[in-house]
């Protein structure tokens, strides 16, 4: 704290220089700083859009207003009424975001988001072509590619094995060889994304 205070005082109380010092410091990039806070609902929603390169179909009306409204609505359902904080300090929940109703809404959002397959329906969607960019001929490499795209997330070998097993299991519960096709991308890869977005590790920044 002291070294940042010195920058602030020494640079004529410049917020710009203070921010520069913080964002370029070793502490900012340390392992302790990564995945130390729970994503706020806005971070969860907007981050999910950006990390997978989602597109947006506004339906009827102004594109920007409809997109923003969807973000606000989803965030509010998760417990964060954007631009209407509980007090002047804003939200200081962190682990408080992890509650029964909030987590259920996160799971519901991730399912609805990744299930929206095309521009035919209003809302954010990820096309099969976009998902194909992260899909690999080997199931384990596919899992790791999506863990990287959605984070990068560090998960246990057991979690990787479980996600890999999901890709190699058909709807009847039988073990099958992993192949890359329009069908597997549309079904299994979308399911994989939903499972990753439901992981405890994905809830953290």
Tell where the protein language model's regions lie, with residue ranges.
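Flexible, low-complexity segments enriched for small/polar residues
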Residues: 1-11, 17-205
